[in-house]
Design a protein with these regions (language model features):
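Tubulin/FtsZ superfamily GTPase core signature
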Residues: 1-276
Length: 276
C-alpha cells in the first residue's frame, strides 16, 4: 500500500504508526482535527448516519492519493458511519480495508450494533470485489499474543504489532526470495488476516480467528548467515508448512535478512463472511 487513510480515533492512531516508515503517505480523518493537506476535520454529528451525511466532496483532499490505498477504521465508533461515503470517493483506487474489531462485551449497546452492521457490510463489499480485500484485526487476539500489556501505552503496543507486521509483509513481498512457491490468492479469497509464527515451535497466532481459511502464505525472514550455514532449515520450513496445510492451500517464501532474530509472518485468506 502506498497510501494509508485512517478514519476515527482508532484508524488515525494506526495510520500515524505507518508514518514512521517512508514508504507510506498518511492521511487522517476525524472529529476535531484541523484541516491540513493530510488531515481532515469531520463535523461532530450524532451516530453513524449523522457522520455519513456530514461528508461532502473529498476530491481536493484526495487529489494526490494514488496507487494502493489502505483504509483503516474501527467499526464501533460513530465516525465509522462516514466510511461508505468516503470509500465511494476512493473507488477508482485499489482499496484494502483494515478493520479493527473490538470485544463486543466491552461496548455499549449502540457501539455494539454499529460494529455488527459495519462488520458484515464491509465483508460483503469485499466479497463483491468493491475492495481488493478486507483485513480483519481482533484487539482481544492481539492482547493474547502480546501477553501482559501495561494499561499506559496499551493501544500503542497493539497498534505497533499490527503495523510492524503488515509493513514487514509488504517489504518481503517486494524483496527477492531465496526460495518460494507463492502464487496470487484465489479471486474470491478477499477476507484476510495477518499473524505471527514461532519459528522454533511452529505455533501460529492470527490477528483474527478466521473460519474456513482457504489459503495461507508464510513469509520466512531468516538471518542470511544461518541460511548459508545451517543445513536443516529447509526441512524445518517444509515441515512447518506441511503441518499447516490441512484442507488449506499453503505456500511459502524464504527471505534473507541481516536481523539477529528470525521472523515468520502468516497471511490467511477466506472467501466466507466471518461471524462473531
Amino acid at each position: 500500500m502506498e497510501t494509508v487513510i485512517g478514519l476515527g480515533k482508532a484508524g488515525c492512531a494506526i495510520a500515524e504508526r505507518f508514518s514512521q516508515y517512508p514508504q507510506y503517505e498518511v492521511y487522517k480523518m476525524d472529529v476535531g482535527l484541523k484541516r491540513t493537506p493530510r488531515t481532515y476535520g469531520i463535523k461532530q454529528s450524532s451516530g453513524h448516519e449523522g457522520h455519513e451525511n456530514s461528508i461532502g466532496s473529498l476530491k481536493r483532499f484526495f487529489k494526490d492519493v494514488k496507487g494502493d490505498v489502505l483504509f483503516v477504521v474501527g467499526g464501533s465508533g460513530d465516525v465509522g458511519g462516514a466510511s461508505l461515503r468516503i470509500l465511494e470517493q476512493l473507488k477508482s483506487r485499489n482499496l484494502h480495508l483494515l478493520y479493527i474489531y473490538s470485544d463486543p462485551e466491552l461496548l455499549g449497546e449502540t457501539a455494539r450494533t454499529q460494529q455488527r452492521v459495519t462488520f458484515n457490510v464491509f465483508q460483503e463489499y469485499a466479497r463483491s470485489a468493491l475492495f481488493e480485500q478486507i483485513i480483519l484485526i481482533d484487539n482481544s487476539r492481539l492482547e493474547s499474543i502480546l501477553g501482559d500489556v501495561p494499561i499506559i501505552g496499551f493501544y500503542e503496543k497493539l497498534n505497533e504489532l499490527v503495523v510492524s507486521t503488515i509493513h514487514m509483509v509488504n517489504v518481503l513481498r517486494h524483496t527477492d526470495s531465496i526460495m518460494d512457491n507463492i502464487s496470487s490468492p484465489h479471486e474470491i479469497s478477499r477476507i484476510v488476516s495477518y499473524g505471527l509464527v514461532d519459528f522454533e515451535t511452529g505455533a501460529e497466532n492470527l490477528f483474527f480467528n478466521l473460519d474456513n481459511v482457504r489459503e495461507k502464505v508464510y513469509y520466512y525472514a531468516i538471518n542470511e548467515e544461518k541460511l548459508r550455514e545451517q543445513g536443516d532449515l529447509h526441512k524445518k520450513v517444509i515441515a512447518q508448512v506441511k503441518e499447516n496445510a490441512k484442507n488449506t492451500k499453503t505456500t511459502y517464501g524464504i527471505y534473507p535478512t541481516q536481523y539477529d532474530e528470525d521472523y515468520v509472518y502468516c497471511v490467511a485468506y477466506s472467501s466466507i463472511v466471518q461471524e462473531k
